[in-house]
Amino acid sequence: MYYGFDIGGTKIALGVFDSTRRLQWEKRVPTPHTSYSAFLDAVCELVAEADQRFGVKGSVGIGIPGMPETEDGTLYAANVPAASGKPLRADLSARLDRDVRLDNDANCFALSEAWDDEFTQYPLVMGLILGTGVGGGLVLNGKPITGQSYITGEFGHMRLPVDALTLMGFDFPLRRCGCGQMGCIENYLSGRGFAWLYQHYYDQSLQAPEIIALWEQGDEQAHAHVERYLDLLAVCLGNILTIVDPDLLVIGGGLSNFTAITTQLAERLPRHLLPVARAPRIERARHGDAGGMRGAAFLHLTD
């Protein structure tokens, strides 16, 4: 059995998957905020419960925001203060007497989608998250590509390309990102960015769902806004896809629920790619809230 943990600032979620990659059981508990020992106990107790329930010693994978293992072997995860700065992988491997694998939660999202029954036919899968921020991951032949700093797939911190300024206007404001840089595409393509663009051009403060509702009602202003957003997304993705050249692009996050993104993006991409390039198949993520647990569990699939 494959045990996958999706750990965030508020909850520790465990999903148990069988050899056919089907979810057999799941359980969630609150994330301890201050005590590292309480945090370790919470994870170990869930593993012990799963071992007893299924009569096996399952493999353990964990998806967690941040950098799963720094140079000194410790976790960096600002949203999980009880475990940040601690040697989480080593400590859990020792306590559970098995190889515990950690990866970034965005990489686990991409891995979950790459192991979808239909998507396993694609060697190179790119996951793109358009949510509170912009992120994602890359999976090659069923294995995540992590890089030395676990930042592979941090697409949101690429800068706006010059073609974006041609589209938006050269007086378009370059916003300061939370990472400290200027002009990161996360500030324009995330759910927050979607709403900010609307306010910038129309001087109206609406949230993304409200704008999308107007678009669905045929509102001309919302329609123009969505067209501009999709053109900007295509411009930025053109650079990324030229570097990565994936077979499949899976889009997740809150904005993936807006069907225009997956249905209208493909027709905009070719003008931003090399003439010989083929745009990837574009699909909406299929596994929702279970994706983090799935991807973490599947860190052990390709041994």
Curated annotation (Swiss-Prot):
One of its GO terms (biological process) is N-acetylglucosamine metabolic process. It catalyses: N-acetyl-D-glucosamine + ATP = N-acetyl-D-glucosamine 6-phosphate + ADP + H(+). CDD domains: ASKHA_NBD_ROK_NAGK (cd24057). It comes from the Bacteria. Pathway: Cell wall biogenesis; peptidoglycan recycling. Signal peptide: none annotated. ATP binds at residues 4-11, 133-140. Zn(2+) binds at H157, C177, C179, C184. One of its GO terms (molecular function) is ATP binding. It is an enzyme of class 2 (transferase). Its EC number is 2.7.1.59. Catalyzes the phosphorylation of N-acetyl-D-glucosamine (GlcNAc) derived from cell-wall degradation, yielding GlcNAc-6-P. NCBIfam families: PRK13310.1. Belongs to the ROK (NagC/XylR) family. NagK subfamily. HAMAP family: GlcNAc_kinase (MF_01271). This is N-acetyl-D-glucosamine kinase. The gene is nagK.
